Curated annotation (Swiss-Prot):
Cofactor note: Binds 1 zinc ion per subunit.
Protein name in the entry: Isoleucine--tRNA ligase
Reactions catalysed: tRNA(Ile) + L-isoleucine + ATP = L-isoleucyl-tRNA(Ile) + AMP + diphosphate
GO cellular component: cytosol
Species this protein is from: Geobacillus kaustophilus (strain HTA426)
Alphabetically ordered keywords of this record: Aminoacyl-tRNA synthetase, ATP-binding, Cytoplasm, Ligase, Metal-binding, Nucleotide-binding, Protein biosynthesis, Zinc
Length: 924
């Protein structure tokens, strides 16, 4: 007889290799065919809503690793919530207006000048939709479940219509105004920029010290002194109208070889060193406020430069006397307003000097630096020229330097709602907690928001002008424009005359002849995405404002978190979100930023081709995403190894359930042996820990708990021990059915617990569970597992956890015996233990076959105490252990070594246990 035929070896079609790159798309096709998103929404209808509102990625180019991290994190949360008592819709969105699309079209050879604005905008829209289709395909490949057929898109008419209403509501509350103000200006984009569109990079700039001769000392100065300023922007000297000092600082008049200079007392030493004044002395000291209204002369124009007082002056650097050009700086502008100074801005939108800078007109501002410095030297005003490398604002899209330039722009007042904004921040839950400090400080310190852009591709600012130039924004015009946009899209603004965009018969006191013009600027794209709480959460029936969660990268504290907060508080007085969670950036394996030049860019599509989406998702779960995270081939291989172990654990359990039907064969929980109940108690603990980790968005804890449970609790303990029962015992024996009961409960629970992170694998497991109690086609249509009721659970855990410590001792002794070649596999060993008192009591109380549990052929507990163990015993923490080779023959069927092999003459190579099983169940 071939005894192999009598063993119940695992059988399953669940493959050992994941082959995810091939299998995942097949699974996704299946989900699509069953319309899984709709099914989940129908199943969870009527439950409390959990709304994670998707921050819209920009519709341009392939997705990068930051996108993948972001979308996978969102998907894990949404999937978990929909299995945890919530209805969790997920509506993905796209941000579609702005310069990158205009630039992309220019690169494709689209000549904007050769077509009307409306035509150009149609091309932009077409391009945006192509990009959306491309990105949608890539996001779906990540396994992200959502309403992909009905996303929100910022260029859609219904979205733009709501955005106009947000603008109108803000205008109605007096929060929108037009003003001449210095704003970040990008010569390379020829447009104003918001703070969120600025990034800081190192730049080399000239560093000059310039002397302004005093013209009228007002009795405080003699009139022959020269006030020393320091600047890194010589091109702004032609726009100088004042010199600012701090009212409370001391200022020295110093003598240097007969010439007198004015500098802040605290900086005199460093200025002297910088300029190279060898011998200098203090002639007198005055307070800044005494210098107010002293008149200096511009170094090379016939023009005064007034000394003014400003709280913004510091002694961090420079001279304490600040060159002030109201057209080129926010502080300069504000102090200029206070003193009634004109706003002079001799630089055009392309960055070229104008006629208002005689001698330099037509020069690009960077080139003018040199010419102006030479001019200062000619007139004897240049005290020192050097160069510094410093952090300087750049246009985040063109990567070129920006300038401050006073222009007429539309602004949203932050000042008027600042306290409400700060209160809303306080009422929001920020994860991590430092997020609150970050956004609080930004909102506390930020200026008003410049919302106008001098471009074509965006939502028009819905303002009309009367004959006298007065801006017109009324409830009536806003309502009408909003309805027009809903019907025709915002292109209608560029296709029709102003009169055709106004309500029929509209009149206004500013236009007695009924002639109106319209604004040509568009809104900042941050106003687009920042209006999504109104245009998406309020507009759509399946969503609600405030959202439960916004989740984006940490760059969005100044971006979307901020613009959404500003518009929502302006319109509703409340934040648009209850909670905000931020993640870090994705770096390479060495912690460097990814860049094409370094050749260290890891692309999601490539990772999925090589490893599969579930591996990428498992990587997301494995990292501390609230800080910056690292990814590399090596890291992904480590994650793949963890995946392989989890998969193998599933495969082993599935293979050993091939003949198990829980409805027919399950053993009632109360009738299971202790070790089986202990395993279920461990499963209960896992369920509680994993759910808690998901609830607190701690996916790394889910990853570690699941990995530990599969490798340590299951593979290395229970499953290893259970093989002797599963393969050897009779198919329908109580012991085997008990183990199968545990395996069934465990495989079902684990498939559900891992489903939010590994949806493809979880569903593959689900399909392969034989005779499932829950007859649903996808694990996504189930709920998270509940703990199994076990009598005396805590006492059971305490007792068996203590046994695991004793087991560790015995395993150490076995390992040492193996290394010393005393034994081979553990089944060739005979073990005698000499326990300490506690351990003796424990071992005596266990309702289990310890020989089987320890996977040895013979096991005995000596009568002698621990201290009386013979010299050959290895003394460990709880027991002293003697390991010897087991005596007897090896049973051909179960591999146990015993002297009783052949006791049944009809089975000379079997132990009595196997002979009995074969006789009972397999005899011909």
């Amino acid at each position: 007889m071939d005894y192999k035929e009598t063993l119940l070896m695992p059988k399953t079609d669940f493959p050992m290799r994941g082959n995810l790159p091939k299998r995942e798309p097949e699974m996704q096709k299946k989900w699509e065919e069953m319309d899984i998103y709709r099914k989940v929404q129908e199943r969870t209808k009527g439950r409390p809503l959990f709304v994670l509102h998707d921050g819209p990625p920009y519709a341009n180019g392939d997705i990068h690793m930051g996108h993948a991290l972001n979308k996978i994190l969102k998907d894990i949360i949404v999937r978990y919530k929909s299995m945890s008592g919530y209805c969790a819709p997920y509506v993905p969105g796209w941000d579609t207006h702005g310069l990158p699309i205009e630039t992309a079209l220019a690169k494709q050879g689209v000549d904007r000048k050769s077509m009307s604005v409306a035509e150009f905008r149609k091309r932009c829209e077409q391009y945006a939709y192509e990009q959306i289709d491309n990105q949608r395909r890539q996001f779906k490949r990540l396994g992200v479940r959502g309403d992909w057929d009905n996303p929100y898109i910022t260029l859609k008419p219904e979205y733009e219509a709501q955005q106009i209403k947000v603008f109108g509501e803000m205008a109605k509350k007096g929060l929108i105004y037009k003003g001449l103000k210095p704003v970040y200006w990008s010569p390379s984009s020829e447009s104003a920029l918001a703070e969120a569109e600025i990034e800081y990079k190192d730049k080399r700039s000239p560093s000059i010290y310039v002397a302004f001769p005093v013209k009228n000392g007002k009795g405080v100065l003699e009139g022959d002194e020269r006030i020393v300023i320091w600047t890194t922007t010589p091109w702004t000297i032609p726009a100088n109208l004042a010199i600012a000092v701090h009212p409370d600082l001391d200022y020295h008049v110093v003598d240097v070889s007969g010439k007198r200079y004015v500098v802040a007392a605290a900086l005199a030493e460093s200025v002297a060193k910088e300029i190279g004044w060898d011998a200098w002395s203090v002639v007198k000291t005055v307070k800044g406020k005494e210098l107010e209204y002293v008149v200096a002369r511009h170094p090379f124009y016939e023009r005064d430069s007034l000394v003014v007082c400003g709280e913004h002056v510091t002694t961090d650097a420079g001279t304490g006397c600040v060159h002030t050009a109201p057209g080129h700086g926010e502080d300069d502008f504000l102090v200029g307003q206070k003193y009634g100074l004109p706003v002079l801005c001799p630089v055009d939108e392309r960055g070229y000097m104008t006629e208002e800078a005689p001698g330099f007109a037509g020069m690009f501002y960077e080139d003018a630096n040199k010419a102006i410095t030479q001019k200062l030297e000619e007139v004897g005003a240049l005290l020192k020229l050097g160069f510094i490398t410093h952090s300087y604002p750049h246009d985040w899209r063109t990567k070129q330097p920006t300038i401050f330039r006073a222009t007429t722009q539309w602004f949203a007042s932050i000042d008027k709602i600042r306290n409400e904004l700060l209160q809303a921040i306080k009422e929001t839950k920020w994860i991590p907690e430092w997020g609150e400090i970050r956004i609080h400080n930004m909102v506390r310190d930020r200026g008003d928001w410049c919302i106008s852009r001098q471009r074509a591709w965006g939502v028009p600012i819905p303002v009309f002008y009367g004959e006298n130039g007065e801006p017109i924004i009324t409830d009536e015009t806003i309502e009408h424009v909003s309805n027009l946009f809903r019907q025709y899209g915002s292109n209608v603004w560029f296709e029709r005359e102003a009169k055709d965009l106004l309500p029929e018969g509209f009149t206004h006191p500013s236009s007695p002849n009924g002639i109106f013009t319209k604004e040509t600027d568009i809104m900042d794209v941050w106003f687009d995405s920042g209006s999504s709480h109104q245009a998406v959460l309020v507009e759509r029936d399946d969503l609600v404002r405030p959202a439960d969660l916004y989740l984006e990268g940490s760059d969005q504290y100044r971006g979307w978190f901020n613009s959404s907060l500003s518009t929502a508080v302006a319109v509703t007085g409340k934040a648009p979100y209850k909670g905000v969670l931020s993640h870090g950036f994705v770096l390479d394996g060495e912690g460097r930023k990814m860049s094409k030049s370094l050749g260290n860019v890891v692309v999601p599509a490539k990772v999925m081709e090589q490893f599969g989406a579930d591996i990428l998702r498992l990587w997301v779960a494995s990292v501390d995403y609230q800080a910056d995270v690292r990814i590399s081939d090596h890291i992904l291989k480590q994650v793949s190894e963890v995946y392989r172990k989890i998969r193998n654990t599933f495969r082993f359990m599935l293979g050993n359930l091939f003949d198990f039907d829980p409805n027919q064969n399950a053993v009632p929980i109360g009738e299971l042996g202790e070790v089986d109940r202990y395993m279920l108690a461990k499963l209960n603990k896992l369920i509680a820990k994993v759910k808690k980790a998901y609830d607190s968005y701690d996916f790394a804890a889910v990853y570690h708990e699941m990995n530990h449970f599969c490798t340590v609790e299951l593979s290395a303990f229970y499953l290893d021990m259970a093989k002797d029962i599963l393969y050897i015992e009779a198919a329908d024996s109580r012991a085997r059915r008990a183990v199968q009961t545990v395996l069934y409960e465990t495989v079902v629970a684990l498939a559900k617990l891992i489903a939010p992170i590994l949806p493809h694998t979880a569903d593959e497991v689900w399909e392969h569970i034989p005779n499932r109690r829950e007859n649903v086609e996808s694990v996504q249509l189930t709920d998270m597992p509940e703990p199994i009721a076990i009598d005396g659970e805590e006492a059971l855990l305490a007792k068996w956890d203590a046994f695991m410590d004793v087991r560790d001792d015995i395993f150490k002794a076995l390992e040492n015996a193996r290394n010393e070649k005393v034994i081979g596999k553990s089944l060739t060993a005979s073990v005698i233990v000499y326990p300490k008192d506690e351990a003796r009591k424990l071992l005596a109380s266990l309702d289990a076959d310890l020989r089987q549990l320890l996977i040895v052929s013979a096991f005995s507990i000596a009568d002698e105490p621990y201290d009386a163990a013979p010299a050959e015993a290895e003394r460990l923490d709880h027991v002293a252990v003697i390991v010897r080779p087991a005596e007897g023959e090896t049973c051909e069927r179960c591999w146990t070594v015993t002297k009783e092999v052949g006791a049944d003459p009809s089975h000379p190579t079997l132990c009595p246990r196997c002979a009995h099983i074969v006789n009972e169940h397999y005899s011909a």
